[in-house]
Regions:
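Short strand-turn motif at the edge of the Rossmann-like AdoMet-binding core
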Residues: 30, 61-65, 91
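SAM/dcSAM-binding transferase cores
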Residues: 101-175
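A short, hydrophobic/aromatic-rich structural module that often spans a beta strand
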Residues: 55, 80-81, 113-114
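Conserved Class I S-adenosyl-L-methionine
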Residues: 45-46, 71-93, 103
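Acidic/polar loop patches that form or flank catalytic/metal-binding clefts of enzymes
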Residues: 60, 85-90, 112-116
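Short acidic/glycine-enriched loop/turn segments that link adjacent beta-strands
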Residues: 96-99
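The AdoMet/dcAdoMet-binding core of the Class I SAM-like
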Residues: 1-57, 67-71
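Short, solvent-exposed coil/turn elements at secondary-structure transition points
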Residues: 12, 92-94, 108
């Protein structure tokens, strides 16, 4: 696809210096150790946000929720402090033999607002029928998070609101 451009190099330097705006920034990063640690910083995510075109999205893996739950929670919290919409999702990664968490981050694009029918229609329009994994149902499915992952990725204010609603129901039932 002529719209696709793959850039390999110093991501921090590139994102800091570019004046371009991107519809999508997909980060396939090393673990956040050593030199790669800066690529997981709030500063870098802010710079990525600035490099997005209106309606654009940043997509990245946020870790293995079973093996490193603290990393998933930390990154989700950091991203929620920068982007208006952060939608974590999970999938099994055969290479690692584990479920991994990713996130779509944007100020306008909400991938959960797309229905299975809309996804299937777009796949058909773009003549992508040979896809082996992705379809409308898998789109909806990857965003259906198990409770233990929800607990990791929900920002504290949402947890407080949810807890308040539950307590309100309990109080009302007790009266």
């Amino acid at each position: 696809n002529p719209k696709l451009r793959v850039l390999i190099g110093d991501g921090m330097k590139f994102i800091r210096e570019t004046a371009e705006r991107f519809d999508l920034i997909a980060l396939d990063l090393n673990d956040p150790m050593g030199p790669a640690e800066a690529l997981y910083s709030a500063e870098f995510f802010q710079q990525c946000r600035h490099a997005l075109a209106p309606g654009g999205a940043l997509v990245l893996h946020i870790g293995a929720p079973v093996a490193r739950p603290e990393r998933v929670a930390e990154l989700a919290q950091r991203l929620n402090g920068i982007f208006r919409i952060v939608r974590p999702y999970t999938m099994y990664i055969p290479l690692y033999g584990a479920q991994w968490a990713m996130a779509v981050c944007s100020d306008k694009l909400d991938p959960k607002s797309l229905t299975a029918d809309e996804i299937d229609r777009r796949i058909e329009q773009r003549k992508l029928q040979d896809l082996r994994f992705y379809n409308g149902e898998t789109h909806e499915g990857v965003f259906a998070l198990p409770n233990f992952i929800r607990d990791l990725v929900n920002p504290p204010r949402l947890k407080q609101q949810a807890r308040g609603r539950r307590l309100g129901v309990v109080r009302a039932a007790a009266k």
